[in-house]
Amino acid sequence: MKKLLCAVLSGIMAFSTFAVAVPITASAAESQESVSATYGDFEYEINDSSVAITKYTGSAETVTIPSKIAGYRVAYIDQYAFYACTNLSSIVIPNSVTTIGWGAFSSCTSLSSVIIQRGVINIDGDAFYGCSSLSNITIPDSVTEIYERAFSSCTSLKSVTIPNSVTSIGNAAFSNCVSLSSIVIPNSVKSLGHDAFENCTSLSSVIIMSGVTSIGADAFYGCSSLSNITIPDSVTEIYDGAFSKTKWFDNQSDGVVYAGKVAYTYKGDMPKNTKYC
């Protein structure tokens, strides 16, 4: 009887040990799905085996974002991670990063140098909004979309290189960039969002390569220096006010104004007894 009892107890203990071991392993795996921690001046989260920088707590002027933290690839700069870091003057974004999040560097008013290495795919809305010291930016040819207001109100921005990988430029993406003097829209871009370059008052030359089909409302509204614009035959839609308050429009003769092959608008007074369709 004692032997039988010992055998039963041994079996129960063995089963209990096995039953406890499985949940511990599962729990450890689950805990790795979302882990928050700190690495130097970076707060971060681990999600799906990659790192998102959620906040920068330092005050350095020059920052290089690491490509790996805790053995995981740094893939995402979270929304407002560097918001209003007014001491920050230079940032290097490594090729491990695929997304620069919403407002990530907005209102970094001293930021004058940005190096974005090839790897970034999306530059989200307001990413560099109000970076008033930023004078030039080279966007790598891994980027496919520039979202709304991504570089809006970068008032010192004089030069932008848009690569032949970008397919759309979002609403107000470069609005109020008052120092920007020229821009080339590559043939990979299909659409310019509304207000895309609104109130870029120094913008005097715009070259839109064949491939663009749609120019949004007020896209170049208030670009008071804009006198030279090349519009390809690929453009089939130009929305209201796209070229209002530009030198180019002011120099057009009264009557139907064509932008490329599109009858953009009618300038001046319509003839009497004109019937509208």
Task: Label every model-predicted segment.
Residues 1-11:
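Positively charged n-region of N-terminal signal peptides that target proteins for export
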Residues 3, 31-34, 80, 118, ...:
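Intrinsic disorder/low-complexity segments enriched in polar/small residues
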Residues 15-36:
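Sec-dependent signal peptide cleavage junction
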Residues 41-49, 58-76, 86-99, 109-122, ...:
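Structural signature of tandem-repeat unit edges
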Residues 52:
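Condensing-enzyme catalytic core mediating Claisen C-C bond formation in acyl metabolism
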